[in-house]
Amino acid sequence: YGGSFTELGSYIMLPVLKLLGESYTNYRFESLRGENGLDVFTKLSFTYPHALATLTCGLGVKSEGRLLISGTTGYIVAEAPWWKTSYFEVHYEDASHVQKYSDTYLGDGLRYEISDFLTKLRGNESSNFKLTAEDSIFMADMMERFLVEQGRKI
């Protein structure tokens, strides 16, 4: 395999890209390397003018694998494995106010499942959340930046 980030990075970047966009002001990679020199765990942090995002992925590490989106008036949680989620909750400051969403997704594919998840989350049926060429270019650029920072050939 090529390491945690090259194997799993697109999965963890997609929800952040769809929710916060490409207009980050700073990013930072931190990795733990295995004996073979490849990353076994990588954390990617984005700084946006209005938000922070922390993404983690790992091969050879154990984690719960849930998606947590925190905001000023509440948070959204999709339990593991979040990339296959058919259920998520929106929690508000008032602990008794919890919105629960569930649906059965048709077909396979992470990008379609996340797209449907975001469509439901935002309350519209637009196709704006489908994986676009620009999304793919953004994620490929971040992969390239990671490889350069790791001293690996592109």
Model features per residue range: what roles?
Residues Y1-M13:
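Conserved anion/nucleotide-ligand pocket segment
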Residues G2-G3, S102, S126-N128:
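Active-site rim elements
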Residues L8, G109, D135:
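Soluble or luminal CAZymes and related metallo-dependent hydrolases
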Residues I12-T85, I114-N124:
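Contiguous beta-strand/loop segments that form the cofactor/metal-binding neighborhood of enzyme cores
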Residues S86, Y92:
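Active-site-adjacent helix/loop segment of glycosyltransferases
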Residues A95-K100:
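Surface-exposed loop/edge segments in extracytoplasmic proteins
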Residues Y101-S115, L131:
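Active-site loop of classical SDR/Rossmann-like NAD(P)-dependent oxidoreductases
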Residues D116-I154:
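C-terminal helix-rich "cap/oligomerization" subdomain common to oxidoreductases
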